[in-house]
Amino acid sequence: MEKVQQTIRAPRGTELQTKGWVQEAALRMLMNNLDPEVAEKPEELVVYGGIGRAARNWESYQAIVDSLKTLESDETLLVQSGKPVAIFKSHEDAPRVLLANSNLVPKWANWDHFRELEKKGLMMYGQMTAGSWIYIGTQGILQGTYETFGEAARQHFGGSLKGTLTLTAGLGGMGGAQPLAVTMNGGVVIAIDVDKRSIDRRIEKRYCDMYTESLEEALAVANEYKEKKEPISIGLLGNAAEILPELVKRNITPDLVTDQTSAHDPLNGYIPVGYTLEEAAKLREEDPERYVQLSKESMTKHVEAMLAMQEKGAITFDYGNNIRQVAFDEGLKNAFDFPGFVPAFIRPLFCEGKGPFRWVALSGDPEDIYKTDEVILREFADNEHLCNWIRMARQQVEFQGLPSRICWLGYGERAKFGRIINEMVANGELSAPIVIGRDHLDCGSVASPNRETEAMKDGSDAVADWPILNALINSVNGASWVSVHHGGGVGMGYSLHAGMVIVADGTEAAAKRIERVLTSDPGMGVVRHVDAGYDLAVKTAKEKGVNIPMMK
């Protein structure tokens, strides 16, 4: 991949570079994904998650930018794995962009085949929000991480993580949310990363409190704060596959154990034991097969240590990076003895159509986001947990790139919020249109048997019709851009998922599109879980009037 040293930053304000606000939103969000404040390796078009890219190569990026600048408001741009391939006449209520990233026929859906295609310049890895142009930095996963640790606290520690120690690893774009999510819940956390730059970045953005290269220092500080029942996050430089076994050997057992290293990609995401970053990069280039094997062996040691900690009483869970599957394939037959985070903590939220709803101020003015915060605090005042989140986010979350906010809203709530935001743009309360989107990790938009759809009640974990239906209904209902991806989060062969973005530009046409899209999108989550037999989803569907023909 050619590296290009240029600083990309989304335009701010109300002056258009394009022929309409929906096209402008797509252009600004693509560029925002590659803002150095937001992206992990912008010079390689990598946004987050190992090699999750915003465009296939620099030539494709420029062609997408040029296409968006000339795209009419009754045309649709098609993007195939990060490359613009067609512009068709459509209509004003159609999506302005349709994206399909990293999709492979099942028999060929593996990293080896993907890499062959990538080498030939025929494909890119879009992760989830990298290739769909709605990544907002680490805040994008923060509330989900906060909710996960909060639910763990409710289930196991009396509602708070005060006086507990969490051990985790991986401080990239996704995992970087963990330190702040734990401290927001009152706990102490040691978060390991092999790359000093990742830890430095989290400290700079106030997601992590301190840095150390010493396990002894990390443990001493952790114990001190644990005893005081005060929160602190400690970024520890090192390799988790070395440090976790060492802690097991010393008979040190944290209260909570998880992991968010980029284990979904053994070649580009995980560093084997005994290698510096530089040595790993050299081996990756010279002998990728050996590198992958060493990575998998290290991951197996990593999972073995997590299992040992679980046996000693640690609440242990997989945080969606497919590390258990790798260890299982390497012969560790009890790798799945600890659960994934969705069945353990998040599924009840999915049953209510809740998920990581986000919005971005295209103006670039933080005041626009603060005004929308007030909407949440006013309109959803009865939801104290949600309001607490907004108040904490305001105080503790630093914006990356265009100002944005995330909060988990459910069926009915998303459409209500979208209507209000569109009215605020229309009457000038907000200085420019707002982009509304979400992660692909949502209630009705993903099939991922080792993560979002793990251990479904009816055994339908691998049924992939749902994300396709989600993308189809969002497209016909007028989402501004819609994406269908493969392999996000857990790697090639293990997931299919869809994303949507809708622009609130203050027009009456946008109001109608928002109402349709922000109803059907979370509605798919309710439908998915009703179909799988979840009582809470049935209750939600009946209370909210979701029309499901065969619901009992």
From Swiss-Prot:
The keyword Cytoplasm applies. GO terms for cellular component: cytoplasm. SUPFAM superfamilies: Urocanase. PROSITE patterns: UROCANASE (PS01233). The active site is at 407. Pathway: Amino-acid degradation; L-histidine degradation into L-glutamate; N-formimidoyl-L-glutamate from L-histidine: step 2/3. The keyword Cell inner membrane does not apply. It comes from the Bacteria. Binds 1 NAD(+) per subunit. GO terms for biological process: L-histidine catabolic process to glutamate and formamide; L-histidine catabolic process to glutamate and formate. One of its GO terms (molecular function) is urocanate hydratase activity. It catalyses: 4-imidazolone-5-propanoate = trans-urocanate + H2O. It is found in: Cytoplasm. InterPro entries: Urocanase, Urocanase-like, Urocanase_C, Urocanase_central_sf, Urocanase_CS, Urocanase_N, Urocanase_Rossmann-like, Urocanase_sf. Its EC number is 4.2.1.49. Keywords: Cytoplasm, Histidine metabolism, Lyase, NAD. Catalyzes the conversion of urocanate to 4-imidazolone-5-propionate. NCBIfam families: hutU, PRK05414.1. Belongs to the urocanase family. This is Urocanate hydratase. It comes from Bacillus cereus (strain 03BB102).
